[in-house]
Amino acid sequence: MPAGTKEQIECPLKGVTLLNSPRYNKDTAFTPEERQKFEISSRLPPIVETLQQQVDRCYDQYKAIGDEPLQKNLYLSQLSVTNQTLFYALISQHLIEMIPIIYTPTEGDAIKQFSDIYRYPEGCYLDIDHNDLSYIKQQLSEFGKSDSVEYIIITDSEGILGIGDQGVGGVLISVAKGHLMTLCAGLDPNRFLPIVLDVGTNNETHRKNHQYMGLRKDRVRGEQYDSFLDNVIKAIREVFPEAFIHFEDFGLANAKRILDHYRPDIACFNDDIQGTGAVALAAIIGALHVTKSPLTEQRIMIFGAGTAGVGIANQIVAGMVTDGLSLDKARGNLFMIDRCGLLLERHAKIATDGQKPFLKKDSDFKEVPSGDINLESAIALVKPTILLGCSGQPGKFTEKAIREMSKHVERPIIFPISNPTTLMEAKPDQIDKWSDGKALIATGSPLPPLNRNGKKYVISQCNNALLYPALGVACVLSRCKLLSDGMLKAASDALATVPRSLFAADEALLPDLNNAREISRHIVFAVLKQAVSEGMSTVDLPKDDAKLKEWIIEREWNPEYKPFV
């Protein structure tokens, strides 16, 4: 990762080619000398502006769009392929306002309408009809030399942002996640590659759309799918051997098995499984600082046992194991509820591979009449200290369920983290009322504070952007051999223990994304230290803590214009 300094850089372009390069274009900020040298003096208005003047103009243009999120998304996307420095400078100054525009929820609309509103190519498109290792390597080599790419986000678009199978349009989720890597943690955007794997789509709306730009066939599965993915991973390892691989928004049937398959051998990560789990764990750790009770003594019930729910469960288990529990005892503290109720051994035939380690013995619940055990009954039986919602089913955390839980726990920890807000299992004000103001609450979407006994109570957001960018940058900086459970736990612990000055309020369980860069530095530092202690780092990092912190900052990419030579 190049140092974020003011050094001069060599510009290989000139004329209109330079002005059309988002990497090198400065628009009206080119100096008179640069305009002359690079043959663009007649192509720009005579005034020379600062980056801040450009940011101010763009923000005025952005506000003039009005209350049309998708149009704002398109405006910012156009800016990103015109002048990336200006794009990142603008958003970094309005981060909280613009993240919902460039990421969830608005990016979901852009993805759904990808083929209808397509304007310019972004990212790398690999399709299963060209499942040949040599050809895939040739495609990847179009994006640079072996050291040109250090971070890759790859999706097959089956599980996009809660909106499901989006086919080729899923490339935009890889693009958006990369933007957050740069904004929140300083990843060099010129060394990041977003990839979409087009393996067909089962989305009939897209396949029937005459504008659709992807493969018009059923989503491929089985051996052909696995062969294609394996060739893609092999090609990445050969063309960009030092690149860290980030799997994003794969479907329930593939996400965990793919991660389990590749994780022992290559440096890789799945944000939906590990990132979501690590952020939820950080929020739990934050809540446990309030209750002053250890993670290893918690009884945790997860409502919704899909990719996110299982990912959170596995991350909590890993955290408990790191804190000293055996694997079996840690899993014994997790209780999963899915469409068939509390998951028991009798559900083994219909349980996914990810759910099976959490099946409880039927004999442990023999006093329950035959039939499925619903949430309210399960709470009465298990008496959980923590309740997490990942189901996408609004209203499922009922008053009866919350009051039952509050009977057994002095400060119940309740996180309805399904996105968007319309799919939350309960609203924070309902949880607050039904728990008599005792619950510690976090959500998956940004929400205003509660009024609790005349005081403002901040609702923390379990936002993956708080963690995955820093985790990814730490993996890049260390060129880690693998991403270990210890490194993930270090990230969760670091997020939960950043300086309180970075929190929106004293009672907040997680820090404020407004302070993304400072939060990320704290996490990067902790993960690097853990990587070194486990022998996972292949880079000789500074051993002095103060020097390591300086080293991290020096390697951040920042949106600033540098002199050209």
UniProtKB/Swiss-Prot annotation:
Signal peptide: none annotated. The keyword Metal-binding applies. PROSITE patterns: MALIC_ENZYMES (PS00331). It holds the Pfam family malic. GO terms for molecular function: malate dehydrogenase (decarboxylating) (NAD+) activity; metal ion binding; NAD binding; oxaloacetate decarboxylase activity. Its EC number is 1.1.1.38. Keywords: Metal-binding, NAD, Oxidoreductase, Phosphoprotein. GO terms for cellular component: cytosol; mitochondrion. NAD(+) binds at residues 272, 419. Its cofactor is Mg(2+); Mn(2+). PANTHER family: MALIC ENZYME-RELATED (PTHR23406), NAD-DEPENDENT MALIC ENZYME, MITOCHONDRIAL (PTHR23406:SF34). Belongs to the malic enzymes family. This is NAD-dependent malic enzyme.
